[in-house]
């Protein structure tokens, strides 16, 4: 009988101690949300000078975070090549499958896309709501596409020469649309009808041919959609595309901001509602394409990942 009383007292003491710990906040802090990264044109998941460095910066400021830098292909070389020549819709489908199978992402994740990876991850948010994306950070992404020839010096320059010639020959040719990544977000403001009818990727995710309510609902589920624009960008044309702006239809000189576009005024994608609710964040910094300092990154990007 005495033994039972002792056990009861021990159990009571443990319970009271647990309650006291709860009251005093002696709980392990929740694990940080995982981060998914998608690199840009001519880059790879793990280049130590680009995405590898970004991964280390995030891990330095957020200990214990799970960072998945997407590799599209079986090798780093294939990853780079696929950023030019693998159908974007196929890439998005593959990424959705990768995310759905990752047990560490099932409670939600943040996403950060660099250059074209920004609009590709937006497509993931719109098409694949499970697991849920919480914050989307687009660093130099081209959300209204481009109408200028890509400049990429160094090892990929010969590939860009080929792309220039191909886009000039016919960006909306069916075979080119199916096989050339940059053609899939090529947006010709002078021939909007041709773009609208023949773009197999950008025109779809931007609701150009009709309103897919699930796209709208899924994008609006984001907590924050952060867009970073590089004010001295020499690669993206027009630069305003990084904030969802673009050329006024019918010409290629004057640009209009997102808020004056049909996409916004008709709220075809939910961006107007998101803007009014404070879900859209527009950040700008001096510098060329993807040129940002550690200090700027820590001050302006890390808060959305913590």
From Swiss-Prot:
This is Palmitoyl-protein thioesterase 1. It holds the Pfam family Palm_thioest. Glycans are attached at residues 197, 212, 232. One of its GO terms (cellular component) is lysosome. Palmitoylation reduces PPT1 enzymatic activity. Disulfide bonds join 45-46, 96-128, 152-160. Keywords: Disulfide bond, Endoplasmic reticulum, Glycoprotein, Golgi apparatus, Hydrolase, Lysosome, Secreted, Signal. It is an enzyme of class 3 (hydrolase). The active site is at 115, 233, 289. Belongs to the palmitoyl-protein thioesterase family. Interacts with CLN5, ATP5F1A and ATP5F1B. InterPro entries: AB_hydrolase_fold, Palm_thioest. It is found in: Lysosome; Secreted; Golgi apparatus; Endoplasmic reticulum. It comes from Bos taurus (Bovine). Its EC number is 3.1.2.2, 3.1.2.22. Residues 1-27 form the signal peptide.
